Regions:
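An intracellular "coupling" helix at the cytosolic face of ABC transporter transmembrane type-1 domains
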Residues: 11-12, 100-101, 117-126, 130, ...
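Transmembrane helix-loop-helix hairpins at lipid-water interfaces of multipass membrane proteins
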Residues: 14-71, 75, 148-153, 264-268
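Transmembrane helices of ABC transporter permease
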Residues: 9, 13-24, 58-61, 128-182, ...
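A short amphipathic helical element positioned immediately N-terminal to and/or at the very start
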Residues: 1-11, 111
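Hydrophobic alpha-helical transmembrane bundles that constitute the permease/transmembrane domains
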Residues: 22-33, 59-70, 122-125, 129-141, ...
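Helix-loop junctions and hydrophobic alpha-helical segments within the transmembrane domains
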Residues: 91, 95, 204, 305, ...
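Helix-loop-helix
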Residues: 44-49, 53, 146-160, 230, ...
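ABC-type nucleotide-binding domain
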Residues: 318, 324-570
Length: 570
């Protein structure tokens, strides 16, 4: 993938920019010859009429060039903004499609830096690249031709110095490329650390961790500063050499030009035109020199964009569309093995059949693999062995979107967006009406507290629902599932953040909702799963016991020990 493919949707804009650049550069190349004619022919003849005509014509060309340049910049900058938008959207969509294994090893702040800062740098050169390429080609080529046309000897002296400067710039560009890439890397680390610390600001303050957090942030900014200083040294060297070569060229023109004029090999009008063409010739070089920093920074950002866009999701989309209205909810785990990308084995030859409408609970100690079962059913990860079927079909055959339409989940770790209550509930079904949202909230026992909010369902709840209590956030999460109304439910510690009275109310609602739906409940508090049709006890990724609450208590096995330990604590 290269940057040029993003120009394709904007071919007309690109063509306009190139055509405008051709016109303006072409006109600029003719200006010095008109001045040469005025100074060398019109002025000595004292022809006032010709002077006025040619002066007016030159002014008209200047104004025309101004108008075209304005239009080119407007169209070109608009194109640049749109390409930047396309790049950012394509990267964000790609990130959305990546699986959890990718996000387990990547820092959120680092990814945010790539979506925002890196793409922003790329957008800066979208217009400059094609525009300057055309302008420089025409201006430098035309100027070089006329320099030799006016005086070949002086042109050779001057262009030798220009060639030396160009070689020096090429050498320096190679050095700056690696320096800018390193700087972008450090900027990503700074963004990642800042995001992580600010997201956990309550924990930082609660444990008096401000100094430690500051030291951590200070360390990464120090690394960034070192990288930036290396870049600045290259920039300083480039600025110094530009000044030196400019002065050397001016000195050459003065000395050699004076000698030529003394020997009647050059006129004053020739020297003035030569200087004007030299300025035209050097201006693109100066522009390219100043653009070098921006280009290297932009390319460093684009390469980081490419690194992400080339990451292939390990969880591949299927082709079969599951109709949530027709799915019964028969779920089968057949000889399932699962290990996380770091090699940690969680499930080993795991077999479980859940009939449509059955309520099954998964219990066991921390790390037994309970939540991993839910993640596999949702295809947050794919099994490393065996298969999982929904209504007899391997879930890997379903499209991810349709599979997720069939499964509703309420997790212990709730995420609410910085939006209104209604929009947070509507995540369960985006096409739902306000009446549907309120009905779902009532089912989740959330309507009462929502009605007491300043603006009711239109109330803003802050980032991650910071303005709500833990129980209120959990009830909004439940309301999403009530609104979605899927054939399969996953309740992962769904009532963990609720007080006893609220938990009792919600459990009644869940019992009603689960009556005709396949329900997989993951619980640490065993009192919440006593009425499940079947309780599965996990230990080290394997099923060690299975049965109803009464059967397992009579067996006096691991479930009995877990239950009694919790009962004795209470």
């Amino acid at each position: 993938m290269d940057l040029f493919q993003f120009y394709k949707p904007y071919k007309k804009s690109l063509a306009f920019v190139i055509a405008g650049a051709l016109l303006t550069a072409g006109m600029e190349v003719t200006f010095p010859m008109i001045v040469r004619h005025i100074l060398g022919v019109v002025l000595p003849a004292r022809d006032m009429q010709s002077l006025l005509y040619e002066g007016a014509g030159l002014l008209g060309l200047y104004l025309l060039c101004l108008g075209i340049t304005y239009c080119v910049y407007c169209v070109g900058r608009t194109m640049g903004v749109r390409v930047e938008r396309d790049l950012r959207n394509s990267l964000f969509r790609h990130l959305e499609n990546l699986d959890f294994a990718f996000f387990d090893k990547e820092k959120t702040g680092h990814l945010v830096s790539r979506v925002t800062g890196d793409i922003g740098e790329v957008g800066n050169i979208i217009f400059e690249m094609p525009h300057l390429a055309v302008v420089c080609l025409i201006t430098m080529g035309g100027s070089a031709f006329f320099l030799f046309y006016i005086n070949p000897l002086l042109a050779v002296f001057v262009l030798m110095l220009v060639a030396l400067k160009t070689g020096d710039t090429i050498f320096l560009n190679r050095k700056m490329k690696s320096a800018f890439a390193e700087t972008r890397q450090h900027m990503g680390v700074v963004g990642s650390v800042a995001t992580e610390i600010l997201a956990a600001v309550r924990a930082v303050k609660a444990f008096n961790g401000e100094n430690r957090a500051y030291q951590r942030f200070s360390d990464v900014t120090a690394d960034l500063a070192k990288s930036q200083m290396r870049t600045f040294r290259y920039q300083a060297y480039m600025a110094g050499t530009v000044t030196f070569f400019s002065n050397a060229i001016n000195l050459t023109i003065i000395v050699v030009g004076a000698v030529l004029m003394m020997n009647d090999l050059m006129t004053m009008s020739d020297l003035v035109a030569f200087l004007m063409y030299l300025m035209l010739f050097l201006r693109p070089i100066m522009q390219l020199t100043s653009l070098t920093e921006q280009y290297q920074r932009s390319m460093a950002g684009f390469h980081r964009y490419q690194e992400l866009i080339r990451v292939e999701p390990k969880v591949r989309d299927g082709s079969v569309v599951a109709d949530s209205r027709r799915i019964k909810g028969d779920v089968v785990f057949e000889h399932v093995d699962f290990a996380y990308p770091d090699g940690t084995h969680v499930l080993k030859d795991f077999n479980l059949t859940i009939k449509a409408g059955e309520q099954v609970a998964l219990v066991g100690p921390t790390g037994a693999g309970k939540s991993s079962v839910a993640s596999l059913l949702l295809r947050f990860y794919d099994v490393t062995g065996g298969k999982i079927t929904l209504d007899g079909r391997d879930i890997r055959e379903y499209t991810l979107e349709s599979l997720h339409e069939c499964i509703g989940i309420v997790q212990q770790d709730i995420y609410l967006f910085s939006d209104s209550v209604s929009e947070n509930i509507r995540l369960g079904r985006t096409d739902s009406s306000q009446a549907d949202i309120e009905a779902a909230a009532k089912d989740a026992r959330a309507h009462e507290f929502i009605s007491r909010l300043p603006r009711g369902y239109d109330s803003y709840i802050g980032e991650r629902g910071v303005m709500l209590s833990g129980g209120q956030k959990q009830r909004l999460s439940l309301a999403r599932v009530f609104l979605k109304n899927p054939p399969v439910l996953i309740l992962d510690e769904a009532t963990a953040a609720m007080d006893n009275e609220t938990e009792k109310q919600v459990l009644q609602s869940l019992a009603e909702l689960s009556r005709k739906r396949t329900t997989l409940t993951i619980a640490h508090r065993l009192a919440t799963v006593r009425h499940a049709d079947r309780i599965i006890v996990l230990s080290d990724g394997c099923i060690c016991e299975s049965g109803s609450h009464e059967e397992l208590m009579k067996a006096r096995g691991e479930y009995y020990d877990l239950y009694m330990s919790q009962f004795n604590k209470t």
